[in-house]
From Swiss-Prot:
It comes from the Eukaryota. It holds the Pfam family Trp_DMAT. NCBIfam families: arom_pren_DMATS. Its EC number is 2.5.1.-. The keyword Nucleotide-binding does not apply. One of its GO terms (biological process) is alkaloid metabolic process. Coiled coil: none annotated. One of its GO terms (molecular function) is prenyltransferase activity. CDD domains: PT-DMATS_CymD. Belongs to the tryptophan dimethylallyltransferase family. This is Prenyltransferase fsdK.
């Protein structure tokens, strides 16, 4: 199958062509973002098998509700807040949750809302636009409940803005000049049945906390609304055994009633051994076949998935760190393809803590930025893995989608980080829930992002 570029602007989806013809121009910045991300979102939705009605719904949602939140265009002198969501500083991400044997793919948007006050003394952490955005969404989406959201916005942040501005950058989070760790993100999941589910993400910032908020302060915040939870206790016990290996970085929560909302507690690590991936997925042996009847096979499948997307040999030792891709060049900066400090540039993980659960669900994120050879290799690896498990219905569409996202004249073999992460969650029925996260600014061999 050809992996050559097929620009979305040369071959747009039918839904995009129709909307582009009839939706009016609004302003320089709004038109910039709509023309920048609209064709890409349209292509991903089309290739994921969404009905034409669902494509229109998701694209009109993008046009009316998301695009106005993205701030000044990247070309504007007013563009001062560089989001870490993308290497070029844009604040929008797409992801593709792979089909299972009985369900089609699902597409998700993630956005970091930005306005003219982002990063100023009025809003040094850029937290206000996201909260306003959530309340606007609550006016059109049924069943949104922001109780958890307001709780975390109050308990995970201090509010002396002048002090926060002094402490936050660049030393505070050790990020390259110009990039800022976001404080809050909003995820929008477009289900194939037409529903839209939202999640809120929080990266805490308290006075004098150092680089990241300690585990105990995360735990204290969660316990205020959910005092007793076995799954959370299991997570704290696991991560406390080796606090140097897992760094708590973020919380996310479903925007729904506290009694049913799940909390996702995110950690990052510098480690990448295959054995470490298995240790994380079993919570150090706390998750067993009692909780996941197909656990042993799922662990084997996870190792095969990691090998497939990174290109390491089938006999690669389980207790050795993954090798850097040949293109990785430390002289280009600590982050190399979307800047991240070394201590959190290995696996990432979230523990999905549901009310009343005994153990959490665990999702592992495999980073492509350091360990994958190029996007063609990642695409070949993940599609081969899916085909070997009988999940080949959307392989052709996935590959076409990737090629269509590329800048004109580019091929998947010459770019990196179009696929930024591949994640894996074990389902109770034995399946692996696998998601690909898509970069809107893949990198060439010059280590510079290319806006698409």
């Amino acid at each position: 199958m050809s992996l050559n570029s097929a620009s979305t602007r040369e071959h747009p989806s039918e839904a995009w062509k129709s909307l582009a013809q009839y939706l009016p121009s609004r302003s320089t910045d709004l038109d910039y973002w709509w023309q920048r991300i609209g064709p890409s979102a349209a292509l991903v939705l089309e290739k994921a098998g969404y009905s034409i009605k669902s494509q229109y719904d998701a694209l009109l949602f993008l046009y009316h509700w998301v695009v106005p939140e993205l701030g000044p265009s990247l070309l504007s002198t007013d563009h001062k807040w560089k989001s870490l969501l993308q290497g070029d500083g844009s604040a929008f991400e797409l992801s593709w949750k792979w089909n299972t044997n009985d369900s089609p793919p699902e597409v998700r948007y993630v956005v970091e809302p930005i306005n003219q006050f982002s990063g100023t003394l009025l809003d040094p952490l850029n937290s206000q636009p996201s909260m306003v955005f959530r309340h606007r969404l609550a006016s059109i989406l049924p069943n949104i409940d922001l109780t958890w959201c307001h709780h975390f916005a109050g308990s995970l942040f201090d509010h002396n803005k002048a002090r926060l501005l002094r402490e936050m950058m660049p030393e505070g989070h050790k990020m390259p000049a110009g990039y800022t760790v976001p404080s809050t993100l909003v995820a929008l999941e477009f289900l194939q049945d037409g529903q839209v589910a939202t999640k809120s993400y929080f990266i805490p910032r308290k006075h004098g906390q150092g680089v990241w908020l300690p585990i105990a302060q995360f735990e204290e915040s969660i316990a205020e609304l959910d005092p007793v939870n076995e799954a959370r206790a299991a997570v704290v016990d696991f991560v406390s055994k080796d606090p140097e290996s897992l760094t708590p970085i973020m919380l996310a929560v479903d925007d729904k009633d506290v009694s049913s909302a799940r909390i996702k507690w995110y950690f990052a690590t510098a480690r990448t051994e295959l054995s470490w991936a298995k240790e994380i997925m079993t919570l150090g042996g706390r998750i067993t076949t009692k909780h996941l009847p197909h656990l042993e096979q799922q662990l084997d499948d996870l190792i095969e998935l990691i090998k497939a997307v990174t290109g390491i040999a089938s006999e690669y030792p389980q207790d050795v760190e993954l090798p850097f891709a040949p293109r990785f060049d430390p002289s280009k900066g600590a982050g190399n393809f979307v800047p991240l400090p070394i201590p959190i540039a290995g696996y990432q993980v979230h523990f999905n803590i549901a009310p009343g659960s005994e153990v959490p669900g665990v999702k592992l994120y495999i980073p492509m930025r350091r360990y994958a050879r190029d996007d063609a290799s990642v695409a070949k690896g993940i599609t081969s893995f899916m085909e070997s498990r009988g999940r080949n219905t959307y392989i052709k569409e996935y590959t076409e989608m990737l090629a269509g996202l590329l800048p004109d004249g580019k091929e998947l073999s010459s770019v990196h980080c179009l696929q930024t992460y591949v994640s894996c969650l074990f389902k109770k029925n034995g399946e692996l829930e696998i998601t690909t996260y898509l970069g809107m600014a893949p990198y060439g061999d010059n280590h510079k992002p290319m806006s698409i």
